[in-house]
Structure formats: structure tokens, C-alpha cells
């Protein structure tokens, strides 16, 4: 994990140390190295966490002719193969780091290079001779990148709060984004909760040149059904998982696996343990209460693969209240995910033992593992029954007593039956509607602009989704902004 930031054109007199103060606000992302590039036309800063090539690869990295500069957060898994291809085209390399491969690739293929990179990245590339800045983000938005346009100038950084360091960036709430938060429990990209600050969408590049800003999508997911058997599909999935984990095991620093005991992280551990030449470290958190604690499962998995296992009991005397403000600070934007708390303490436990940790995040989206995804499939069958029958079933379900469980069976049944009366995408958002909670009502009451963005209106995400034709095979993968809490830790 690294941090990048910058803005074209040197600041006004008196702002000369701003890029250094922005980099200082990102220091937790890159504790190993800090560097800057400044010219009469741009200020760039980078903080680096060294994972590959610990001796070279400091950033910003400048091309041999001094014209092109790169700041980069991420990892390019196929950089070795691309290095050979670029060497055959006449490029020479001074380091073994993937940053230099990305720089050479951009000089060779311009923005077409991004489709050649397999990995996770947020990158800024500056051409001094052309006065041209290009920002780009990986296919799924694993690495974050925020930007703001003020007049003729562009400002960007790996974290939203880093932009606040610059005196030109105001802190005004975007009420439409606030409505999105109460509807979805997070703010989907490209919006942020701050008016005028945007997330660069996944799979996009953005160009600033001659005071003009343009953006273009360079990758888009495409559903291409294949006529293969279940056995063939499983073999292909296993091979792709094996390759993906193998590429993530490449590291010049200690590496471990976050293990929850579920299928996701256990699968990652399997492919890591069967390909690693050293004993792996695993890290887990446990809870009181059978409903949440997966301790028996992750201990069994860790024992089976013989890992060097580390476990943290969250019921110990941990300063949860004291850590809360720091956790929120790292999240940049509000997200109604209580999992941020155990992830924070898990990261704190991991850091003394490993610099890099693999996790099973994203598998539920890939494998339709959430209950709402199954509800979509069941609802499709339910819609084949008469509407009158569905309404009678809903009436009967409302007679069931309310349970004291967090999400009881009767709640799920009522939401499911009422959702079966709605169009498919609108029903998906209906399963658990946060905007109906008391927390959202005062905001809607005090700000008519927010009230008008209800799902029945035209501005809220649910309303937009209900009008968008569904793509075959897609559930609701939240790929508007893929970076997660642990990525910012």
C-alpha cells in the first residue's frame, strides 16, 4: 500500500509546502519512503510501502530523458512478462520494480497500456514536455483515487482527507451523496460525501491537459456465457484462483493470510499453502457468542495447513471506544459496516508479523454468496405466481410475531414477499432499506432536496437502478468503488 498525490501547476506563493503536507497526511500508507517531483508546472508526491525491490524503485520515478514521471500505488502481477516485451522493443530498465515497467509501458503504448496490466493500481503519469497528466485506476477499483477540479486546476490523492490539506479544497456536504448513503449504507462512486470531490471510477483513465479534463473508460465487465460443463467450469475456476494467489505470493517482505474460517479465506489459504515454499502465517479474530464466532472453524483450517497461527480475542480489554475515532478517520467516508472494527484490530495484530496479508474479500460478490442474491433467484420464481396470491401471502406474513433476533425469519419473509411485488432491481434494493430508519428521517425533513431523492424520485441510486435494464447474470456487485476498509489500514 502506497499513497500518491499531486496537482498541475505550482501553487500560488505561500503554498509552497502544500504537497509535503499532503504527503505527510498519507504517511501511514507509505512508511518506508517519501519523495517529491516539482517543476514550474506540477507538484507530485508519493509515500511508499516497500513490497517488491526494497533497494530501488523509490517514487516519484522519472524516465531516463527526464520527461515522464510516475507515482504509483498498487502491484502489477504480470510485470515480469511485460518487462521482457518492452526490452524487446528497446526499453532499458534500472530497477526490478513493477513501477518502472508501468512507466515504460505508458511511454510505449500510452493509455492503451492499462489494458495490458494485470493487477491493482492507482497511478499518475506526467509528461513535462506535453504538460499532460494522466490518472488511471484498476479494473475493479481496488486501489482508491480521489480528485477535484477547481477552476483550471486538478487535485488528486489516494485518500479524500488528504485533499483537505490543500487550501483550495472546501468541505461541503453533497446532499445527493448523503441520500445515497442512507439508501445503500455507503456512497457509490463516482460521488463522495464531499461536494466537488470525486472518485475516479474503476476501469477509467482521466487526462488533464491544457486546463481541460477528459475521462474515458478503458475496461468494462462483459458477461459472456460459455457452453461448458460444471466440471470444466470448476477446473477453470480452480486454475484461475491458483494463478491469482500465486501472483499475490510474490513479495520481498513477510506475508500472511487473514483467516476467518469461512469458505472465502479458507480457499485462499489452501491455494497459498499448497504453493508457498515457507510456512505461512495466519491471523484471526474471535468473539463471544456462537452466532458470530468462527473460532472452531479457523483453528481447524489453520491446524490442517500447519500455519503459524495468531489469534486475537475481541472480548479482551481492547480500547474499542478509543480506537473508534481513528477507525473512522481511516475510512475517509462513512460506511455502515461494523466489520471495520474487528478489521482494524486484526490489522494492528498483523503488522508486527507481516507487511502483506491476503484475504477472502470479494468472494461473496463473485460467488453470489449473500442472502440477498439468493433472494433474487427465489423472487424470480415467485413472480411466476399470481399477484393476488403474493399479496395474500404478504398479508399472512404480517400477522407473524416480531422476533428479538437481529434479522429474524419473519423480517426476511416480509421483506421478501413485499419485494416480490416490485421490479427485479428495485426489489434487490428493497430487501433491507436503510433509508427507512429513524437516522435518515431528520435529514430528509430538514433538507427538501434530500427528501425529493427518495427511491420513488429520480436521484437516488434505487430509483436509477429500477429504471436500468438488468444485465444477464449480474446480481448487484458493488463495483462502483471497490476499495475496502482494510485497504486503507
Language model features: what each stretch is:
Residues 1-331, 343, 347:
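Cysteine-centered catalytic environments shared across enzyme families
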Residues 46, 151, 210, 300-489:
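Glycine-rich active-site loop/lid subdomains used to bind and stabilize high-energy intermediates
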Amino acid at each position: 500500500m502506497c499513497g500518491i498525490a499531486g496537482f498541475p501547476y505550482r501553487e500560488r506563493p505561500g503554498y509552497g509546502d502544500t504537497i509535503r503536507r499532503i504527503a505527510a497526511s498519507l504517511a501511514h500508507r507509505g512508511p518506508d519512503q517519501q519523495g517529491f517531483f516539482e517543476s514550474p508546472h506540477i507538484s507530485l508526491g508519493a509515500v511508499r510501502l516497500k513490497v517488491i525491490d526494497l533497494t530501488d524503485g523509490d517514487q516519484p520515478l522519472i524516465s531516463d530523458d527526464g520527461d515522464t514521471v510516475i507515482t504509483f500505488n498498487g502491484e502489477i502481477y504480470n510485470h515480469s512478462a511485460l518487462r521482457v516485451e518492452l526490452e524487446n522493443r528497446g526499453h532499458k530498465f534500472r530497477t526490478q520494480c513493477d513501477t518502472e515497467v508501468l512507466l515504460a509501458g505508458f511511454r510505449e503504448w500510452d493509455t492503451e497500456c492499462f489494458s495490458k496490466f494485470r493487477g491493482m493500481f492507482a497511478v499518475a503519469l506526467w509528461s513535462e514536455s506535453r504538460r499532460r497528466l494522466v490518472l488511471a485506476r484498476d479494473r475493479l477499483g481496488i486501489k482508491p483515487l480521489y480528485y477535484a477540479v477547481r477552476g483550471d486546476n486538478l487535485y488528486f490523492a489516494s485518500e479524500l482527507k488528504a485533499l483537505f490539506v490543500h487550501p483550495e479544497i472546501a468541505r461541503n456536504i453533497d446532499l445527493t451523496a448523503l441520500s445515497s448513503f442512507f439508501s445503500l449504507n455507503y456512497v457509490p462512486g463516482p460521488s463522495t460525501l464531499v461536494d466537488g470531490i470525486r472518485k475516479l471510477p474503476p476501469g477509467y483513465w482521466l487526462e488533464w491537459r491544457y486546463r481541460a479534463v477528459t475521462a474515458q473508460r478503458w475496461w468494462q465487465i462483459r458477461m459472456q456465457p460459455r457452453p461448458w460443463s460444471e466440471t470444466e467450469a470448476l477446473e477453470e475456476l480452480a486454475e484461475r484462483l491458483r494463478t491469482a494467489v500465486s501472483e499475490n505470493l510474490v513479495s520481498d517482505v513477510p506475508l500472511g493470510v487473514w483467516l476467518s474460517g469461512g469458505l472465502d479465506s479458507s480457499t485462499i489459504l489452501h491455494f497459498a499453502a499448497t504453493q508457498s515454499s515457507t510456512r505461512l502465517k495466519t491471523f484471526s479474530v474471535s468473539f463471544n457468542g456462537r452466532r458470530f464466532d468462527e473460532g472452531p472453524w479457523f483453528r481447524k483450517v489453520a491446524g490442517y495447513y500447519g500455519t503459524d497461527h495468531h489469534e486475537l480475542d475481541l472480548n479482551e480489554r481492547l480500547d474499542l471506544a478509543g480506537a473508534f475515532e481513528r477507525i473512522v478517520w481511516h475510512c475517509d467516508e462513512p460506511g455502515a459496516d461494523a466489520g471495520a472494527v474487528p478489521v482494524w484490530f486484526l490489522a494492528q495484530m498483523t503488522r508486527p508479523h507481516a507487511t502483506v496479508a491476503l484475504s477472502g474479500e470479494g468472494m461473496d460478490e463473485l460467488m453470489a454468496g449473500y442472502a440477498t442474491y439468493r433472494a433474487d433467484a427465489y423472487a424470480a420464481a415467485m413472480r411466476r405466481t399470481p399477484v393476488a396470491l403474493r399479496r395474500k401471502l404478504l398479508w399472512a406474513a404480517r400477522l407473524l410475531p416480531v422476533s428479538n433476533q437481529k434479522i429474524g425469519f419473519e423480517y426476511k419473509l416480509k421483506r421478501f414477499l413485499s419485494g416480490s411485488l416490485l421490479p427485479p432491481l428495485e426489489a434487490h434494493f428493497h430487501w433491507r432499506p436503510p433509508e427507512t430508519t429513524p437516522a435518515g428521517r431528520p435529514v430528509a425533513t430538514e433538507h427538501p432536496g434530500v427528501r425529493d431523492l427518495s427511491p420513488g424520485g429520480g436521484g437516488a441510486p434505487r430509483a436509477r437502478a429500477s429504471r436500468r435494464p438488468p444485465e444477464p447474470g449480474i446480481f448487484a456487485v458493488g463495483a462502483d468503488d471497490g476499495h475496502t476498509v482494510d485497504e486503507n489500514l
